[in-house]
């Protein structure tokens, strides 16, 4: 699990802890926390017909797009890119949440920019709005809410809780001019960020870095949940306010804290990524259609939406519009046992005004002597010019000529 996944989840934990804490520690904290949440609120316009609303007060399943933005520290002041992109679906009725991590280099359509590019460029081109619209189209689900966090947030939060203590078993190292001593040490925000980011000097490489990242976020959350953390709540709120943007309201967060906690008992985590490809000397991740479809289906089910139609189901629905009753057809957008078996070839018959028509797998055959005006003609099909033509065969003068 990479740094930003840990940071994003850590910040979500902090938000929920703050909301829970205000209920126990008085009106002043309640007022300050309410003000902070109002300060980080930023609505976006969604350009999608996938449905952008979910009633959290009524405990409806909902989705959140989580983004870790690579700006705000190390001299980076531009809008930045979403270095980490995750989609979390939360379903309190099933007591379950699903978290899908999206590789930053996924090649996809950037909605609103009329181009194909890396997924993380959507935020760079159009902020949270373009990122949301792009992910909605990619995953074929509505994105009900979002939370974005910039790089400086980790540093500020470590400072806000008064630092964290770790045991640096790697030995002293320097990253971007910041030296981290060996042994049991107390880290401030600057050294804590370096400790979480360093990879090349760790004998375990990225595995070791992931372990340190997990350690840092766990230490932060533990400090926030402690009495010491509560006493520093104002600094914690300031760190959140300076580094987080979301379209979740204060009431939404109160409802999540009180009505959705059961949904966090089970969290299924998956990674959506494809195969590596270099296109015009640029590295991309190209998604496998089957893996993408599986992820789409998982998320739609978690949100209580109808199952996404497979290509097989789309083909069957195409034939159904011409009055061919196919028993294994699953209409587009519907789910059920029929869709589960749609990959197998089945045979069924239907009466039409023109005669008996049989559909078997992907072929159609009319009963002998019967003419069906709805018969599909493939304009690209090969016709043998030397084949025998029956002079008594009926030819429909209105049939399209190819």
Across the structure, where does each feature detected by a protein language model lie?
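Entry/capping segment at the start of metal-dependent catalytic domains
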Residues: 3-95, 288-292, 296
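C-terminal solvent-exposed extensions
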Residues: 51-52, 247-372, 376-378, 384, ...
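Flexible, polar/acidic helix-loop-strand segments at domain edges
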Residues: 55-58, 159-235, 359, 388, ...
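Extracytoplasmic
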Residues: 59-62, 79-85, 94-102, 114, ...
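Second-shell loop/turn segments in exported
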Residues: 73-76, 116-125, 140-145, 200-207, ...
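Soluble non-cytosolic domains of exported or imported proteins
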Residues: 81-82, 113, 122-129, 148-152, ...
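Sec-exported extracytoplasmic/periplasmic mature domains
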Residues: 92, 107, 111, 124, ...
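Amphipathic, coiled-coil-like alpha-helical scaffolding segments used for oligomerization/assembly
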Residues: 120-179, 247-249
């Amino acid at each position: 699990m990479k740094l930003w996944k840990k940071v994003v989840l850590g910040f979500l934990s902090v938000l929920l802890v703050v909301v829970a804490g205000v209920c126990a520690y008085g009106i002043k904290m309640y007022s300050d926390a309410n003000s902070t949440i109002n300060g980080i609120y930023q609505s976006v316009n969604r350009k999608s017909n996938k449905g952008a609303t979910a009633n959290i007060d009524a405990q409806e399943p909902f989705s959140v797009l989580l983004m870790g933005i690579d700006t705000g520290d190390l001299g980076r002041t531009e809008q930045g890119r979403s270095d980490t992109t995750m989609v979390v679906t939360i379903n309190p009725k099933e007591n379950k949440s699903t978290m899908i991590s999206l590789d930053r280099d996924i090649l996809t359509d950037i909605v609103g920019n009329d181009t194909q590019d890396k997924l993380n460029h959507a935020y760079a081109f159009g902020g949270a709005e373009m990122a949301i619209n792009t992910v909605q189209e990619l995953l074929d689900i509505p994105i009900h809410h979002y939370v974005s966090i910039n790089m400086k947030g980790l540093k500020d939060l470590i400072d806000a809780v008064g630092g964290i203590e770790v045991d640096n078993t790697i030995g002293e190292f320097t990253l971007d001019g910041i030296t981290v001593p060996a042994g049991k040490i107390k880290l401030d925000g600057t050294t804590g960020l370096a400790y979480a980011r360093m990879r090349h000097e760790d004998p375990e490489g990225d595995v070791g870095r992931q372990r340190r990242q997990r350690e840092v976020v766990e230490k932060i959350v533990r400090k926030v949940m402690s009495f010491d953390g509560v006493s520093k709540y104002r600094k914690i709120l300031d760190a959140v306010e300076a580094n987080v943007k979301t379209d979740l309201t204060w009431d939404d967060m109160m409802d999540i804290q009180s009505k959705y906690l059961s949904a966090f008992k089970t969290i299924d985590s998956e990674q959506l990524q494809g195969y590596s490809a270099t296109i015009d000397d640029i590295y991309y991740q190209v998604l496998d259609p089957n893996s993408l479809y599986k992820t789409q289906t998982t998320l739609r089910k978690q949100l209580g939406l109808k199952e996404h139609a497979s290509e097989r189901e789309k083909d069957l629905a195409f034939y159904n519009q011409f009055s061919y009753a196919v028993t294994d057809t699953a209409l587009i957008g519907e789910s059920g046992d029929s869709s589960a078996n749609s990959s197998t070839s089945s045979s069924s018959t239907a009466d039409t005004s023109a005669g008996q028509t049989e559909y078997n797998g992907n072929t159609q055959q009319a009963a002998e002597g019967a003419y069906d005006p709805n018969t599909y003609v493939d304009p690209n099909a090969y016709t043998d010019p030397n084949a025998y033509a029956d002079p008594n065969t009926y030819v429909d003068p209105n049939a399209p000529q190819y």
